[in-house]
């Protein structure tokens, strides 16, 4: 990861009593502190509507570290929160100006007492409909201004908007009070080690990059499959979003950008994001006819009975689509994106299937054509990369067989891989936005996704529910998932 943060700072969590704070943010800060990445002077300040004292938040910190930390010794720590050095809490409804004023007073006090130099990282772990009011109040209180020699940055969780129009409005509202280099739109997939390795694998190895194009690649498949449903936590939100907005608009499209983009001019935030934007700009929005022919949506049996879900809901818990990237490198190559809840197994991967050789030389000894070569990038679990190819079987009889060459992170490296939120928080503290999305990225992703949602709104809804839990999704999706049907001829 990056080097140690040198400058003092205060990390302010909005929604500090919530699930994301307990499961991800607090354990991430603990690990950064225990591994020596944080400076001597820093503080963690939480705020939410829940009434509690500083000491009560410290108890929650200890509990969160013991329950959610993946460090072997986290639970054995006599006082895990001591690694965070200073933890404070300010209760209040930050959609109200008076609560933000009280928070400002508390942060100014911490600045003065601890010498934090006005450096602040705000993390908005709150419901999307609260974001604009909170930002408005922070601006009115002067808390977004950067004094000379100090910095203020704001991290925004997904979803960033609900469609193209709302994303544009939110971006415009933020640009009125923040500079783009203060805005950190988080997608936790970009913090995963296996995702960051994609660019290294592509542009650090001369044997692979020359064949990543329409001449050699037959199709690309990206799958984000989950075995869980709502689990009683997200029903109300999810029922207004669905699989397409929740996963494809961000995680799946970000993976597509990394696997399909051109080499950046340099390995800095703007150069990388410039190339990702070019990929998104090459995704042509779909017409209603194309949506009908090239997408499938599903809903698992039992979804309508989940807490917070409309009993007559037509929200999709599964989405699959086929598209193309209309640029010189990829034109005509089928791109298949798939995501779903309550699937047979949990995994995220990218599969690249290559074209067949021009002539099958082994037709006398084996089935022709043989299975095509393929490259699988495993994002989770068992992070790694596999290359499948054809090999001659040992023996006097000439026969061929598919084999795999495999790289696994756990088998190749002894050191612990940082959790996604550890990496992302550390990069935000350093002011490096390479792993965060830019405003034009967000809007171009929504441009493509909104065309599909608009198409669905004009088509009759499918007969939901249309797939059983612990399956591969609706039967109709087989036309995308069967390689012989999606393969470019």
Identify the residue ranges that each predicted region occupies.
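Secretory/organelle targeting and membrane-embedding segments
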Residues: 1-156, 160-489
């Amino acid at each position: 990861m990056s080097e140690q943060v040198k400058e003092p700072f205060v990390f302010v969590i909005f929604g500090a009593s919530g699930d994301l704070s307990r499961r991800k943010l607090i354990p991430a800060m603990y690990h950064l502190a225990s591994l020596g990445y944080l400076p001597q002077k820093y503080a963690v300040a939480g705020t939410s509507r829940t009434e509690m004292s500083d000491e009560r938040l410290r108890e929650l910190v200890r509990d969160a570290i013991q329950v959610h930390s993946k460090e072997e010794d986290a639970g054995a720590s006599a006082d895990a929160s001591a690694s965070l050095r200073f933890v404070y809490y300010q209760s209040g409804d930050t959609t109200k100006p008076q609560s933000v004023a009280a928070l400002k007073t508390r942060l100014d006090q911490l600045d003065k007492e601890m010498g934090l130099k006005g450096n602040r990282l705000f993390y908005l772990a709150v419901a999307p409909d609260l974001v604009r009011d909170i930002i408005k109040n922070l601006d009115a209180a002067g808390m977004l201004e950067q004094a000379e020699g100090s910095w203020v940055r704001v991290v925004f969780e997904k979803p960033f908007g609900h469609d193209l129009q709302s994303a544009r409005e939110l971006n415009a509202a933020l640009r009125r009070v923040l500079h783009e280099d203060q805005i950190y739109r988080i997608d936790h997939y970009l913090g995963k080690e296996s995702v960051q390795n994609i660019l290294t694998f592509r542009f650090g190895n001369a044997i692979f990059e020359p064949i990543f194009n329409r001449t050699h690649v037959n199709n690309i498949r990206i799958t984000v499959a989950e075995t869980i449903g709502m689990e009683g936590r997200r029903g109300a939100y999810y029922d207004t979003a669905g699989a397409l907005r929740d996963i494809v608009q961000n995680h799946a499209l970000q993976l597509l950008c990394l696997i399909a983009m051109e080499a950046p001019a340099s390995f800095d935030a703007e150069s990388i994001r410039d190339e990702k934007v070019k990929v998104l700009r090459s995704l042509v929005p779909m017409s209603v006819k194309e949506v009908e022919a090239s997408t499938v949506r599903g809903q698992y049996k039992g979804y309508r009975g989940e807490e917070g879900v409309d009993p007559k809901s037509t929200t999709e818990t599964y989405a699959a689509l086929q598209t193309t990237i209309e640029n010189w490198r990829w034109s005509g190559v089928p791109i298949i994106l798939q995501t779903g809840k309550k699937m047979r197994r949990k995994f995220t991967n990218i599969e690249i299937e290559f074209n067949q050789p021009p002539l099958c030389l082994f037709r006398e000894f084996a089935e022709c054509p043989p299975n095509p070569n393929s490259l699988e990038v495993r994002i989770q679990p068992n992070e790694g990369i596999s290359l499948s190819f054809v090999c001659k079987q040992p023996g006097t009889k000439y026969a061929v067989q598919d084999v795999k060459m495999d790289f696994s992170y756990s088998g190749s490296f002894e050191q612990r891989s940082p959790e996604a939120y550890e990496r992302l928080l550390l990069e935000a503290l350093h002011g490096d936005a390479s792993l965060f999305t830019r405003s034009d990225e967000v809007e171009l992703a929504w441009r493509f996704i909104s065309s599909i949602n608009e198409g669905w709104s004009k088509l009759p809804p499918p007969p939901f529910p249309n797939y059983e839990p612990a399956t591969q999704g609706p039967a109709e999706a087989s036309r995308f998932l069967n390689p012989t049907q999606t393969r470019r001829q």
